[in-house]
Amino acid sequence: MRKSILRIALVAMVGAVVASCSLGTEPTFQENDLLGLWQEDGKEAFVRFTAEKDSTGVYKYGCEWNEGEGVSESDLTKYGNGWFKWKLVKADLTEIHLMENGGADIPKVYTVRKLTDTELLYEDDFKNVHSFQKMAGK
C-alpha cells in the first residue's frame, strides 16, 4: 500500500513538473506592432504594413519596394505588383503577393523571430533571416 502511494505521488510530481515546463511554447506577436514602415538593415529595401478599415471589416495590406533598384513607394500601383495581403498568427507571418497582370497570387510564409516597436526579425523557408528597423513617424 505504501509503495502504491509513493508511486502515485511520484507520477503526480513528474506530471506537475512536465506541465509547468515552457519547452515548446511558441511565441505570440501582436499584429499592431507590425504596422508602419520598416527598412531592411544595410539595404534600401522597405516594407510597409497597413490595416485599413471600412464598413465590412479590416483589411490588412502591405507593400514593398527597393529604392536601390530605382523603385519608390509612389511608383507602386495600389493593390498591384509590390502589394500583398498579410496576416500574423502567433509567430507565422503570411504574405499573399498580388499580381496585377492576372497571374496567380503568390504566398510567402515567414517565421517572426523578434518583433518590438523598433525591430523586426523574420526567417523564410530557406532559412534566410531578414532584419528591419522601424522608420519613426512613418
Feature locations, PLM:
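Bacterial N-terminal signal peptides that target proteins for export
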Residues: 1-9
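C-terminal motif of bacterial Sec signal peptides marking the signal peptidase cleavage site
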Residues: 17-20
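Edge beta-strand at a domain terminus
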Residues: 23, 27, 81-86, 119-138
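Short beta-strand segments that buttress and anchor functional surface loops
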Residues: 38-40, 95-101, 120-123
